[in-house]
């Protein structure tokens, strides 16, 4: 069996380099969801319907809640109301086979059933109440310390106390 693709985020916190997060994508169970995320890491699909590049580079983690998760992926508006998939509109929930079992789980943020775009979150704890509602499509394999550093500047409202930016991102060739 082919190995899962790996992608990376080079993160900054408050403008300072914070390290690299490497994520493995579950292309076996969630191929459509994983491919969307992979392509948004590389930027290879060009410009989307919004007129913005279909690329996470330069976008922020706009919602960070300690003891819950770090959310990003809104590269069109930057505030949690935007984002766009490589498929154009929103796309369906592929399946809920994988669960929110603990820190480092990578899952799709949504606004209800079948509303996946580009927003995602990385769990910092087990979030089993999200099972069956959000599609788990990967996990952090390196840089959980960076995720924890991001979590530390979160707040109960979700607004980070410093800007958290994906300075660079892409796919790691195996």
Curated annotation (Swiss-Prot):
Binds cyclosporin A (CsA). CsA mediates some of its effects via an inhibitory action on PPIase. GO terms for molecular function: peptidyl-prolyl cis-trans isomerase activity. This is Peptidyl-prolyl cis-trans isomerase CYP19-2. PPIases accelerate the folding of proteins. It catalyzes the cis-trans isomerization of proline imidic peptide bonds in oligopeptides. GO terms for biological process: protein folding. Keywords: Chaperone, Cytoplasm, Isomerase, Rotamase. One of its GO terms (cellular component) is plasma membrane. Its EC number is 5.2.1.8. The lineage of its organism: Eukaryota, Viridiplantae, Streptophyta, Embryophyta, Tracheophyta. It comes from Arabidopsis thaliana (Mouse-ear cress). The keyword Cell membrane does not apply. Belongs to the cyclophilin-type PPIase family. It catalyses: [protein]-peptidylproline (omega=180) = [protein]-peptidylproline (omega=0).
């Amino acid at each position: 069996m082919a190995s899962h693709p790996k992608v990376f985020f080079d993160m900054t916190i408050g403008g300072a380099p914070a390290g690299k997060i490497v994520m493995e994508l579950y292309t076996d169970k969630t191929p459509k969801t994983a491919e969307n995320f992979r392509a948004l890491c590389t930027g290879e699909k060009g410009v989307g319907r919004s007129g913005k590049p279909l690329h996470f580079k330069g976008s922020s983690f706009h919602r960070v809640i300690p003891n819950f998760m770090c959310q990003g992926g809104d590269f069109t508006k930057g505030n949690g109301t935007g984002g766009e998939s490589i498929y154009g509109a929103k796309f369906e929930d592929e399946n809920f086979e994988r669960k929110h079992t603990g820190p480092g789980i990578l899952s799709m943020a949504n606004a209800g059933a079948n509303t996946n775009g580009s927003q995602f979150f990385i769990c910092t704890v087990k979030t089993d109440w999200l099972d069956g509602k959000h599609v788990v499509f990967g996990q952090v394999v390196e840089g959980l310390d960076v995720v924890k550093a991001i979590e530390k500047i979160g707040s109960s409202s979700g607004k980070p106390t410093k800007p958290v930016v994906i300075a660079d991102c892409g796919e790691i060739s195996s």
